[in-house]
């Protein structure tokens, strides 16, 4: 497992970043939809 930690670390960090971006996008979309419906 310690033979090549670089190729194993990069996809994990990329996956985590994309996951956070996805959650942020969903959160912003939900806030916009709730604001639009309440107004």
Curated annotation (Swiss-Prot):
Residues that span the membrane, as ranges: 18-38
Superkingdom of the organism of origin: Bacteria
One biological process term in Gene Ontology: photosynthesis
Keyword set includes Signal: no
Keyword field: Membrane, Photosynthesis, Photosystem II, Reaction center, Thylakoid, Transmembrane, Transmembrane helix
UniProt keyword Thylakoid present: yes
Cellular component aspect of the GO annotation: photosystem II reaction center; plasma membrane-derived thylakoid membrane
Recorded topology in the membrane: Single-pass membrane protein
Subcellular localization, as worded in the UniProt entry: Cellular thylakoid membrane
Family under the similarity heading: Belongs to the PsbL family.
Subunit-structure text: PSII is composed of 1 copy each of membrane proteins PsbA, PsbB, PsbC, PsbD, PsbE, PsbF, PsbH, PsbI, PsbJ, PsbK, PsbL, PsbM, PsbT, PsbX, PsbY, Psb30/Ycf12, peripheral proteins PsbO, CyanoQ (PsbQ), PsbU, PsbV and a large number of cofactors. It forms dimeric complexes.
NCBIfam families assigned: PRK00753.1
Protein's job: One of the components of the core complex of photosystem II (PSII). PSII is a light-driven water:plastoquinone oxidoreductase that uses light energy to abstract electrons from H(2)O, generating O(2) and a proton gradient subsequently used for ATP formation. It consists of a core antenna complex that captures photons, and an electron transfer chain that converts photonic excitation into a charge separation. This subunit is found at the monomer-monomer interface and is required for correct PSII assembly and/or dimerization.
HAMAP family per UniProt: PSII_PsbL
Protein name (Swiss-Prot/TrEMBL): Photosystem II reaction center protein L
Organism, as annotated: Prochlorococcus marinus (strain MIT 9313)
The encoding gene: psbL
